[in-house]
């Protein structure tokens, strides 16, 4: 174990998360059809400020992320500041780390607080899979640029005459990795085969996720952290996540065909997280600032770590690389954790990471450690369900997990929690949270 790395300011203040909030998450082209991510971000930040009871003038900075970016609003963070009545002097910038984007936003805010450059800030993310940047072909794009420089109508017509019919077709956003051409689901399939993750085990984890998420909603455990959303034309309220299958069965899951490897695969729509719309944010500040404002902490950020690995194989093992670092920096072990929350991009990816957590061979050969961090106690794992059930608005998932874990730790009387996620590009994130 390496030496602990305390997350404190020069005055010894810890990093406080005062509050966290998210919109209900909705499957693509359902409740938020036509609502761009920037509007979802404005909705959640406005409500977070209202619930926190502090003046927006006190917010020094807003760090926000969006993975599927819209060309007309490339800096979503600044647009949220300008669209929510916050001070125009509030600093704002956007970040992107694929599925770990709001983890990055939280880390950036923490570093700014530690450096003393800000006292109070908001971190979060929003994504819409329903409002997408539909592009044009490279041939048409080049022609449009050239036509803009053409001096006469005849020159423009000559340029356009070279185009073929297929060049005029719209181009949807890529779903594959830019560097490899592999889809995330392809990597999930590879990991399932490499690590012997059966279809039955994947379906069982997916069912567990939906059952626990349904129970969390039924018991009212999520009501304080999920706002009611109203969107144009304001005819009805959006109250709950709409992806959770409250009465599904393994028999139903077993009927689905593989989604990626049609002949020999095991990854299906049921044991994968769906395309989702939503937003989430957290309010952060130094411990002394929270005390001065009379704001009780929801919890503390104890440590964080990011990792980067190969993209050709095992690209979704980021949690297995980032988690040991976060544990070391917090000065704790896996056994010290009260809760463990791992992003469920795919059941196969989740189960593969759990295997690597417990693998001494992986620890020695990949991490250079003498032994594994340990086997996960499933009674601590994703106790309210995970992304397979809730959905995955890419940039919002980290903030959802952080808020959900802190609230559940508080409900249980305190303790330490791990939140961790894989991300496209072979990236990983892990954070240790504490509730007293």
UniProtKB/Swiss-Prot annotation:
Enzyme class: transferase
EC identifiers of the protein: 2.3.1.16
Superkingdom of this protein's organism: Bacteria
Gene Ontology CC: one annotated term: cytosol
InterPro entries: Ac-CoA_C-AcTrfase_FadI, Thiolase, Thiolase-like, Thiolase_acyl_enz_int_AS, Thiolase_AS, Thiolase_C, Thiolase_CS, Thiolase_N
Annotated active site: 99, 392, 422
Any matching Pfam family: Thiolase_C
GO molecular function terms noted in the UniProt entry: acetyl-CoA C-acetyltransferase activity
Main subcellular location: cytoplasm
Subcellular location: Cytoplasm
GO BP: any one term: fatty acid beta-oxidation
Keywords: Acyltransferase, Cytoplasm, Fatty acid metabolism, Lipid degradation, Lipid metabolism, Transferase
Gene3D superfamilies linked to this entry: 3.40.47.10
Acyltransferase in keyword set: yes
Pathway(s) of this molecule: Lipid metabolism; fatty acid beta-oxidation
Coiled coil spans: none
Enzymatic reactions: an acyl-CoA + acetyl-CoA = a 3-oxoacyl-CoA + CoA
Subunit (UniProt): Heterotetramer of two alpha chains (FadJ) and two beta chains (FadI).
Function: Catalyzes the final step of fatty acid oxidation in which acetyl-CoA is released and the CoA ester of a fatty acid two carbons shorter is formed.
PANTHER family recorded: ACETYL-COA ACETYLTRANSFERASE, CYTOSOLIC (PTHR18919:SF107), ACETYL-COA C-ACYLTRANSFERASE (PTHR18919)
Family statement: Belongs to the thiolase-like superfamily. Thiolase family.
Name by which UniProt lists this protein: 3-ketoacyl-CoA thiolase
Gene expressing this chain: fadI
């Amino acid at each position: 174990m390496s030496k602990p790395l305390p997350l404190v300011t020069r005055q010894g203040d810890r990093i406080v998360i005062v509050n966290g909030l998210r919109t209900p998450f909705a499957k693509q082209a359902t409740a938020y059809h036509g609502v761009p991510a920037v509007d979802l971000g404005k909705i959640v930040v406005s409500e977070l400020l209202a619930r926190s009871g502090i003046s927006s003038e006190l917010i020094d900075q807003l760090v926000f992320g969006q993975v599927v970016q819209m060309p007309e609003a490339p800096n979503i963070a600044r647009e949220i500041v300008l669209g929510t009545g916050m001070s125009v002097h509030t600093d704002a910038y956007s970040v992107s780390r694929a599925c770990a984007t709001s983890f990055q936003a939280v880390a950036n805010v923490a570093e700014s607080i530690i450096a003393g450059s800000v006292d109070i800030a908001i971190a979060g993310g929003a994504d819409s899979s329903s409002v997408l940047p539909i592009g044009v072909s490279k041939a048409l794009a080049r022609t449009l640029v050239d036509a803009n420089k053409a001096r006469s109508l005849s020159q423009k017509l000559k340029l356009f005459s070279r185009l073929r019919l297929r060049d005029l077709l719209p181009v949807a956003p890529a779903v594959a990795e830019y560097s490899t051409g592999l889809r995330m689901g392809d990597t999930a399939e590879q990991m399932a085969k490499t690590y012997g993750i059966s279809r039955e085990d994947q379906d069982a984890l997916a069912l567990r996720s939906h059952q626990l998420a349904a129970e969390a909603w039924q018991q009212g455990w999520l009501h304080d952290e999920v706002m009611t959303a109203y969107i144009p034309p304001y005819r009805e309220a959006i109250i709950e996540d709409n992806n959770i299958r409250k009465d599904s069965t393994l028999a139903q899951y077993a009927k689905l065909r593989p989604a990626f490897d049609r002949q020999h695969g095991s990854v299906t729509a049921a044991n994968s997280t769906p395309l989702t719309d939503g937003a989430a944010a957290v309010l952060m500040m130094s411990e002394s600032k929270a005390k001065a404002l009379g704001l009780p902490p929801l919890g503390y950020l104890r440590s964080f770590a990011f990792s980067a690995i190969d993209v050709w194989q095992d690209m979704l093992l980021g949690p297995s690389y980032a988690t040991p670092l976060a544990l070391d920096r917090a000065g704790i072990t896996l056994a010290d954790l009260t809760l463990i929350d791992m992003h469920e991009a795919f059941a196969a990816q989740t189960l593969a990471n759990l295997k690597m957590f417990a693998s001494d061979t992986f620890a020695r050969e990949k991490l250079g450690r003498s032994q594994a961090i340990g086997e996960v106690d499933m009674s601590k794992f994703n106790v309210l369900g995970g992304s397979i059930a809730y959905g995955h608005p890419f940039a919002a998932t980290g903030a959802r997990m952080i808020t959900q874990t802190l609230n559940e730790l508080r409900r249980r009387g305190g303790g330490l929690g791990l939140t961790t996620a894989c991300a496209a590009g072979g990236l990983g994130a892990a954070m240790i949270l504490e509730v007293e």
